[in-house]
Regions:
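Non-catalytic interaction-recognition regions
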Residues: 1-259
């Protein structure tokens, strides 16, 4: 079986890893002192690979066997010390540690009335998305989780997530979208055609709010590129909130046909 092949490969390569990295028995602590550090075990005495060995096998399969150019892992921030070991293991088995990028995610605190809350007794200290979605609409959960970059802790406000006013950024953005759709539908029903960019008289664009909106729309493609390059999709959410704000200002200050 394929899993047995990878197991044998990792067991064989583990000797190379131990020879290269297993001699280090000291490590620096946060205060600059040294303490004993255990060698990383890849195969237990009973011959069963450890989770670390399975992780190495996964990356070997992804990069060497399936030919991906890069692996992007999403880990909890409490695994930050594992990053260097994984990159070192990849180097030891003939891969390249620099082909692994790791995004470290911080923990999420659920809040209600400004206080931490536990939603489920049956799941212990961990709260599943199933538990969360019993209280919060899925669109709110997706949007609010993705408003924060990976390195920031999240205080997820359950009260805010179910509001239907401008305090909830999900509602705020959806309201802008609904206004836009209403305008487009009205214009279509009245037979108003859209002029191409080459037919627009730019001298008529004089209101600050409409100029701000145009500038923001022009910046959107680059924002997508930046979000991809930095592995930070939260940039899109924050941009969309700013864009909705710019549209609401435009809507309030300019007369719009069909509105």
């Amino acid at each position: 079986a394929a899993s047995d092949v990878y197991k044998r490969q990792i067991m064989y390569r583990s000797a190379q890893y131990a020879a290269k990295y297993g001699t280090v028995n000291k490590k620096k602590t946060d205060d600059g002192t040294e303490e004993e550090a255990k060698d990383e075990v890849l195969v237990r005495a009973n011959g069963i690979p450890t989770y670390f060995a399975a992780d190495i096998a996964y990356h070997y399969n992804k990069l060497a066997t399936r030919g991906f150019a890069k692996a992007i892992d999403v880990w909890g921030a409490d695994h930050h010390g594992h990053v260097a070991r994984m990159k070192g293991a990849m180097d030891a088995i003939g891969l390249h540690g620099e082909d692994l990028d790791v995004v470290l995610m911080q923990m999420v605190n659920l809040m209600r009335d400004g206080q931490p809350v536990r939603m489920s007794k049956r799941t212990g200290n961990a709260i599943t998305l199933t538990d969360l979605l019993e209280e919060v609409p899925i669109d709110s959960a997706r949007f609010l989780f993705n408003m924060h970059d990976a390195g920031s802790g999240i205080d997820f406000d359950l009260d805010q997530a179910v509001k239907t006013d401008n305090d909830n950024p999900v509602y705020y953005v959806q309201y802008a979208h609904a206004r836009i759709c209403s305008i487009l539908k009205k214009m279509e029903s009245e037979g108003v055609a859209f002029a191409g960019a080459e037919n627009i008289d730019a001298t008529l664009l004089t209101e600050p709010s409409e100029m701000d909106l145009i500038r923001m729309l022009a910046a959107f493609p680059q924002e997508i590129v930046m979000a991809a390059e930095k592995y930070d999709p939260s940039r899109i959410n924050r941009f969309v909130i700013d864009l909705a704000s710019a549209f609401h200002r435009f809507y309030g200050s300019c007369r719009i046909q069909g509105a």
